[in-house]
Amino acid sequence: MMILVVDIIKGMQTQTAECLIIGEITCKHMIVVLNKIDLLPPEKRGVMIEKMTKRMKNTLANTVFKDAPVVSISAKSGGDSDLNSSSVGIEELIETLKQYAYVPTRGTSEPFLFAVDHCFSIRGQGTVMTGTVLQGSVNVNDAIEIPSMQVTKKVKTMQMFRQPVEQASQGDRLGICVTQFDPKLLERGLVCCPGYITNIHAAIISAQKIRYFKSSVKSKMKFHISVGYETVMAKVSVFGLMENDKSCEKSDDRGDSFSFQQIYKYQDELLSDESDSTKQIEKELPLKQYVLLEFEKPILASSRSLVIGSKLDIDINSNSCRIAFWGKMLERIVDKNYSTAVLPKLKVYKDKCKTGIVDRIKNANEVIGKDIFKKETNIQLFVGLKVNLSTGEEGVIDGAFGQSGKINIRIPGGLKDTTISQINQGSKKKGKNVAVQDDGNDTGPVKFTVAFKRYAYDPEKRMIQL
């Protein structure tokens, strides 16, 4: 559960909206607190509180917090306030908290992960790390690792709310005492069971675009990526699993799984299924969307970490949302040489299409094509690829014809009589404007296309026709 505190005088500000977005990503329950009601004119206070409450309800109507309660308070009334108490509405807030508080589902089966928010020493005892257990459990005498320091320590003692405990699990606020560790080396960070967290150089995440982010999330752009306590710059590459791909495994999952065995389509940008723009409608929305993150420097991250991408260099006073996308970390890439060791395994294709013109006929089953390749192109790479003529015939590239970039195209089913006539007429009219006959038959040049896929990370740049 989260509490969203709003200055009733200023209303929703950019940072308030961003807190709301982060809240939607991280939890499903919220209480809105309208603070500083003591600053409202006494004679208009009731009306203005009601007006702001209604405005907040309208703001939350299209979010997961549409039923969130709104409580108005004065946490600390000013000296000139007409309010008799130093604070107003706190009791109502406490009662609201009691009403909406719930015990979340907890588990202990996952590896231990602990978020440290403070570190200090106690003379004669050791170093205490205070924080929250994010997942799993820990016991006294367990071995724990401080991955940022690559140091393993033994849990000496533990306390919760000043009371000694032998065991703690997910959700607990905890103090862990270890020996022979300088607290100055760790202020905030992660602690885990040995070997659970390592430095990563890249990652693949599930991805969802934030609908309030006005700009595009385009491949090759750089964003600020927040994972745990760290925020670093990373280059993004967007790709998706298309529903019509033959390799697509039918699943109700919306992006929480990833397989290097699947074939994915490269995307110029991250799409949103909540957008109604014309630009959006023209594009096919993938069944699932992913982002490859290539970090400028290594970061520590656990499996299934929450990842948030932002443009923090946008002026906070510009009244624009800076949070661009979010997702879950599905694949951590630890190899420093991932571009050659890992990425070639990633089957992300780009649709390619080349168009040329039939130059002339060799025989009823062969034609010469031109205006598709440069003379320095290695045409041998394209041999065997299927070709479609604009007149309907299908063919195959047999090889190069001469040294000027022309190619031999074999038509297994043979050319139609109308196609032969059209090619011959086009050959006679080289250099002249092509016309359309009175009977409607096109006498222009016969074109052909070669459609294929190329894997973006294939070092050999091979072409594939599925």
PLM regions and their residue ranges:
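Conserved Switch II/interswitch segment of TRAFAC-class P-loop GTPases
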Residues: M1-L20, E24-E50
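Short acidic, glycine/serine/threonine-rich loops at helix termini
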Residues: T16-A17, P41-V47, S81-S87, V128, ...
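Conserved nucleotide-binding/hydrolysis micro-motifs of P-loop NTPases
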Residues: I9-M12, K36-P41, A75-D80, Q135, ...
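Canonical P-loop GTPase G-domain recognition
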Residues: L39-S121
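Residue-level signature of catalytic and energy-coupling elements of molecular machines
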Residues: I3, G23, N35, M56, ...
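C-terminal effector/interaction modules appended to NTPase cores
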Residues: G124-L466
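Long, charged, alpha-helical interaction scaffolds
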Residues: M12, G23-I25, H29, V47-M48, ...
